[in-house]
């Protein structure tokens, strides 16, 4: 197995990702966005060659002290987007990446 920190690059923090985490808490955050769910969901940026079982193993080994169990992993490949740099004079692209939405079993959390 690869080093878990090579598979999981970092936690992905956006408004939508925080809403997914808030829906599992049942504390009123994100109430308008959707229904509450029993299983917490967290979003990570992962290696582009990582598979779903490899992502699950890496997360369980990184958070072994919290004894989390991964229920499911959904992956999304984000394509590079056109971007303008230097006041619109140069055109380029943003970097593409792969993100994983990980669902833990009920009662398991990393936060």
From Swiss-Prot:
GO terms for cellular component: ribonucleoprotein complex; ribosome. The keyword rRNA-binding applies. It holds the Pfam family Ribosomal_L23. The lineage of its organism: Bacteria, Pseudomonadati, Chlamydiota, Chlamydiia, Chlamydiales. It comes from Chlamydia abortus (strain DSM 27085 / S26/3). GO terms for molecular function: rRNA binding; structural constituent of ribosome. HAMAP family: Ribosomal_uL23_B. This is Large ribosomal subunit protein uL23. One of its GO terms (biological process) is translation. Keywords: Ribonucleoprotein, Ribosomal protein, RNA-binding, rRNA-binding. Part of the 50S ribosomal subunit. Contacts protein L29, and trigger factor when it is bound to the ribosome. Belongs to the universal ribosomal protein uL23 family. The gene is rplW. SUPFAM superfamilies: Ribosomal proteins S24e, L23 and L15e. One of the early assembly proteins it binds 23S rRNA. One of the proteins that surrounds the polypeptide exit tunnel on the outside of the ribosome. Forms the main docking site for trigger factor binding to the ribosome. It comes from the Bacteria.
